[in-house]
């Protein structure tokens, strides 16, 4: 059986990625159910680095869509650039690989896949992976203002839950404030009552790996994530690995070096940490409306400095990741 191994020695043969191997393969290019009902991209959540969006679809899906319905990885970057924002990381929570490939993102762009089962509250391991990824990104990008883009299929339920879970557990935000902020900025409200109930009434999740001591939590937790980059060499020159040989796990990509940084840090999670500055959040939508109504949405107004229609993203103009990346594949 083929597995990943971290070059620095923190990946072993007993380390197995969780989640995807039990997923059923879904072939074809059928549009995800209700995908058209949702806005492609929300707005940045004020006081945070988060922006949520629905899953972009690769070009082969476009034959099933009207031109105005298309939303590709390239469209994603254009829409975020139109908000005068810059994306620095994508966290993909979908439980499949069929919607788009990391190779369709700009060269060397940081991309992290966390297979997250839909409809049910994410387990503690998934929550911990997400927190680790966000913390690592913030630590390495404290001198810039790049955003963390998070998506599931619709960019609402799994996405909203994990973003809110982070804001509640790490930033000390009140659950209703976190839910309200996400809903207003996404343009759609959290729909699943089990997610809402857990955010409001569920326990605060630990910010370290429950299977190890706190002082070694970050060091031993890197196996729980799957950081990958788009390939830096042409796609047709990459070695091919059969999905059955890899038991459904993603093909090897480049490791993000923030895993090394994670191994040496133990962060104090504080309610008054300055990533989120508490402020009044106006109700999301028209007065008197119940914003927990299923799939209720309202118009998202563009940012004041929104760029013009001629301001378009081109892969060659995007920034390069200022650190090395590497991987090793063993059998």
From Swiss-Prot:
Active site: residue positions: 152 (phosphocysteine intermediate), 158 (proton donor/acceptor)
Pfam families: DSPc
Record keywords, A-Z: Hydrolase, Nucleus, Protein phosphatase, RNA-binding
Keyword Coiled coil in record: no
Residues of the Tyrosine-protein phosphatase domain: 61-208
EC number: 3.1.3.-
Main location as per UniProt: nucleus
Positions contributing to substrate binding: 153-158
Subcellular location: Nucleus; Nucleus speckle
PROSITE patterns linked to this entry: TYR_PHOSPHATASE_1, TYR_PHOSPHATASE_2, TYR_PHOSPHATASE_DUAL
GO molecular function per UniProt: phosphatase activity; phosphoprotein phosphatase activity; polynucleotide 5'-phosphatase activity; RNA binding
GO cellular component assignments: nuclear speck
Assigned protein family: Belongs to the protein-tyrosine phosphatase family. Non-receptor class dual specificity subfamily.
Description of how the protein assembles with itself and partners: Monomer. May interact with SFRS7 and SFRS9/SRP30C.
Stored PANTHER family: MRNA-CAPPING ENZYME, RNA_RNP COMPLEX-1-INTERACTING PHOSPHATASE
Record's function text: Possesses RNA 5'-triphosphatase and diphosphatase activities, but displays a poor protein-tyrosine phosphatase activity. In addition, has phosphatase activity with ATP, ADP and O-methylfluorescein phosphate (in vitro). Binds to RNA. May participate in nuclear mRNA metabolism.
Protein name, per record: RNA/RNP complex-1-interacting phosphatase
Organism of this sequence: Bos taurus (Bovine)
């Amino acid at each position: 059986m083929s597995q990943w191994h971290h070059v620095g020695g923190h990946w072993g043969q007993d380390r197995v990625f969780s989640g995807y191997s039990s997923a059923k393969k879904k072939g074809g290019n059928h549009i995800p159910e209700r995908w058209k009902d949702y806005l492609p991209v929300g707005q940045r959540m004020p006081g945070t680095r988060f922006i949520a969006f629905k899953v972009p679809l690769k070009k082969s899906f476009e034959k099933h869509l009207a031109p105005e319905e298309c939303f590709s990885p390239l469209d994603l970057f254009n829409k975020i650039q139109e908000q005068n924002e810059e994306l620095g990381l994508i966290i993909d929570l979908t439980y499949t690989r069929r919607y788009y490939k990391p190779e369709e993102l700009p060269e060397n762009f940081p991309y992290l896949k966390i297979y997250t089962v839909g409809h049910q509250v994410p387990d503690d391991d998934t929550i911990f992976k997400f927190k680790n990824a966000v913390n690592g990104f913030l630590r390495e990008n404290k001198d810039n203002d790049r955003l963390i883009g998070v998506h599931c299929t619709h960019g609402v339920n799994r996405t909203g839950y994990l973003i809110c879970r982070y804001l509640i557990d790490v930033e000390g935000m009140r659950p209703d404030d976190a839910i309200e902020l996400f809903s207003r900025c996404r343009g759609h409200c959290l729909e699943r009552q089990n997610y809402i109930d857990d955010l409001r009434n569920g326990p605060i999740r630990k910010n370290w790996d429950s299977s190890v001591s706190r002082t070694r939590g970050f060091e031993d937790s890197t196996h729980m994530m799957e950081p990958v980059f788009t390939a830096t060499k042409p796609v047709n020159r990459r070695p091919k690995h059969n999905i059955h040989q890899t038991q459904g796990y993603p093909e090897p990509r480049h490791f993000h070096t923030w895993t090394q940084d994670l191994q040496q840090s133990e962060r104090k999670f504080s309610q008054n940490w300055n990533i989120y500055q508490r402020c009044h959040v106006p109700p999301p939508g028209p007065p008197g409306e119940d914003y927990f109504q299923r799939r209720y949405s309202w118009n998202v107004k563009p940012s004041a400095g929104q760029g013009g229609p001629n301001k378009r993203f081109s892969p060659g103009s995007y920034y390069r990741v200022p650190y090395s990346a590497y991987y090793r594949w063993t059998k």
